[in-house]
Amino acid sequence: MHAIMLKAKLHRAEVTHAVLDYEGSCAIDGDWLDLSGIREYEQIQIYNVDNGERFTTYAIRAENGSKMISVNGAAAHKAKVGDRVIICAYAHYSEAELASHKPRMLYMAPGNQLSHTSEAIPIQVA
């Protein structure tokens, strides 16, 4: 049996560009791709915190250190500059892999400053 699990997440990144007349995709600062383990051309899910939109696209590399999150093509209708988004990648894991799986999560502060990284989400308390 395999399970689809969270592989990587960029939490509350700010959209820096929304380019309708681009080929599609989401350009992400190359440093963040490397740190999160998201691969170029990998399918990603984007959840817009500000307007509730949820959509699928693929990641492309933006210049390292640029702090860029560029939502391109038709997806540019679903996010505007300044929107806060959660970008997730998921993967299939075998039962054996699940025992040691830990997602890579990057948490962003305002201005797309990397706040911290984590491999676990704290338990939610009532």
Swiss-Prot record:
Pathway: Cofactor biosynthesis; (R)-pantothenate biosynthesis; beta-alanine from L-aspartate: step 1/1. The keyword Cytoplasm applies. Its main location: cytoplasm. Keywords: Autocatalytic cleavage, Cytoplasm, Decarboxylase, Lyase, Pantothenate biosynthesis, Pyruvate, Schiff base, Zymogen. The modification Pyruvic acid (Ser) is found at residue 25. One of its GO terms (molecular function) is aspartate 1-decarboxylase activity. The active site is at residues 25, 58. Binds 1 pyruvoyl group covalently per subunit. GO terms for cellular component: cytosol. Substrate binds at residues 57, 73-75. It catalyses: L-aspartate + H(+) = beta-alanine + CO2. SUPFAM superfamilies: ADC-like (SSF50692). It is found in: Cytoplasm. Its cofactor is pyruvate. GO terms for biological process: alanine biosynthetic process; pantothenate biosynthetic process. Its EC number is 4.1.1.11. Heterooctamer of four alpha and four beta subunits. Catalyzes the pyruvoyl-dependent decarboxylation of aspartate to produce beta-alanine. Belongs to the PanD family. This is Aspartate 1-decarboxylase.
